[in-house]
């Protein structure tokens, strides 16, 4: 019997996105770019988001199709770029992701969460 972990993966994504936004709260871009500890915390959050996205893509293709507006592949791609090209991380892109993409992702996740129990995935 396979356990449905979809809600768990989505919650990991929500928590990591919320954490990343919290880590940079009150920081300017210059402060973020000079703060290695915050950079590392945000990067780890992005890896968690990408890993959960990958799990959802691999195990719940119907859910992915139904929620095609969520940037599942982009999240996986960012995770792969960070994990496999660690010495080449562009922290300006990371900053833009946290300030632009993650608030939007949090809104999208609140919508897709309501669909988790609607159908068996």
Where are these regions (language model features)?
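Solvent-exposed interaction patches of small proteins and small membrane subunits
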Residues: 1-121
